[in-house]
């Protein structure tokens, strides 16, 4: 009976949520209903695998935000593979630039409570605590940033404190506004809320801000930067154990799943790999 009551309560709550979002969409308060895939078995909108950025896309992204607030964040994602919470908690006392082989140590994590930043000295897993070598481009970027910084944080807000959730969203908006993704805004006209659509054209300047050029014809997420880093490690033939360590994966299964998708997602490479394996097999049988 208790179990039946719990199931009934879950269904009631689920239906309540679906009704709220359905009404919000019908009232044109939101554009998409995130609960349409919500079922009694759980789950939500099916997640699509985000592809790693190509070298060209990474270069275009960095060129588009050169000198802007998200630049250092993006560099740390692309060339150190840090998670968002690791980047926003990173302090200069964990970045070692004056050594023969510059590196950084991941020892803190960021999250927010009621939009206020909280920096934790305890990481979720032991694997998250790691030392990451810095490629020359990232080391140079951090040296320049540190020389002009008055904060103990590598990616701080204007006051030198860690970012709140809202401040991070604002930081990321510098990237979103430079994409050609279709976007919407609302205005009240004759007392009515009217939806307007903006369709950016690649290479053109934004009508509202001449400093903004629509230079990105692809979307980017913070996690995609990290995925690009891991993908590049694998394409550079870094062994799975080292990839696991640098990525901070607690489970080797996570690393191997990514490794398999990346390594064998190219038919030509798979054919060569299998051909080599069968050649060795034939030689052993001869």
Each model region followed by its residue ranges:
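Single conserved hydrophobic/aromatic residue that forms the stacking wall/gate
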Residues: 1-8, 13
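Catalytic-site neighborhood detector that most strongly recognizes the C-terminal catalytic loop/helix
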Residues: 44, 52, 139, 247-272
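Conserved hydrophobic/aromatic pocket- or pore-lining residues that grip, position, or stack substrates
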Residues: 17-20, 38, 61, 76, ...
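C-terminal flanking helix
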Residues: 18-21, 25, 263, 267
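C-terminal secondary-structure termini that scaffold catalytic or DNA-interacting sites
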Residues: 99-100, 114-129, 136-138, 159, ...
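Basic, Lys/Arg- and aromatic-enriched nucleic-acid-binding interface segment
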Residues: 26, 30-90, 100, 127-129, ...
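Short, basic (Lys/Arg/His-rich) helix/loop patches that form interaction surfaces
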Residues: 63-67, 80, 132, 147-162, ...
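Conserved tyrosine-mediated DNA breakage-rejoining catalytic core shared by Y-recombinases
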Residues: 39-42, 90-145
